[in-house]
Curated annotation (Swiss-Prot):
Family: Belongs to the bacterial ribosomal protein bS6 family.
Record keyword Ribosomal protein present: yes
One MF annotation (Gene Ontology) recorded for this entry: structural constituent of ribosome
One GO term of the biological process aspect: translation
The keyword rRNA-binding is annotated on this UniProt entry: yes
Coiled-coil regions listed in the entry: none
Protein's UniProt name: Small ribosomal subunit protein bS6
CC annotations in GO: cytoplasm; ribonucleoprotein complex; ribosome
Higher taxonomy: Bacteria, Thermotogati, Thermotogota, Thermotogae, Thermotogales
Keywords: Ribonucleoprotein, Ribosomal protein, RNA-binding, rRNA-binding
InterPro entries for the chain: Ribosomal_bS6 (IPR000529), Ribosomal_bS6_sf (IPR035980), Ribosomal_S6_plastid/chlpt (IPR020814), Transl_elong_EF1B/ribsomal_bS6 (IPR014717)
Function: Binds together with bS18 to 16S ribosomal RNA.
Amino acid sequence: MAYVKERIYESMFIIAPNVPEEERENLVERVKKIIEERVKGKIDKVERMGMRKFAYEIKKFNEGDYTVIYFRCDGQNLQELENFYRVTPEIIRWQTFRRFDLEKKERKAQREKAAAEATESSEGGSED
């Protein structure tokens, strides 16, 4: 079994509330396309959380449209995503971070599955 340096990331971004709904959808699609094409990642899950109020004012807005994307990649091209966020004025906040907890949970599940398969194959081979 070859070890792949694939890591799990979570990227959350907030779109300004004055952006029309159709443009917000297009922006989410553009982010997904950047993750798949430029970052060379594989998207696991997209959560559209909708409009939420802020605890404090951000760029003169009191609310924004939240989206969270979970994806896998080797991490080498993440700067492409950060650059896109930085130059897109409709995105007023963003944060991307590695999810060590999800990676750990996944590795544990893989080890348990491998152990169960090894147990099954050793039991199946000893029958007369």
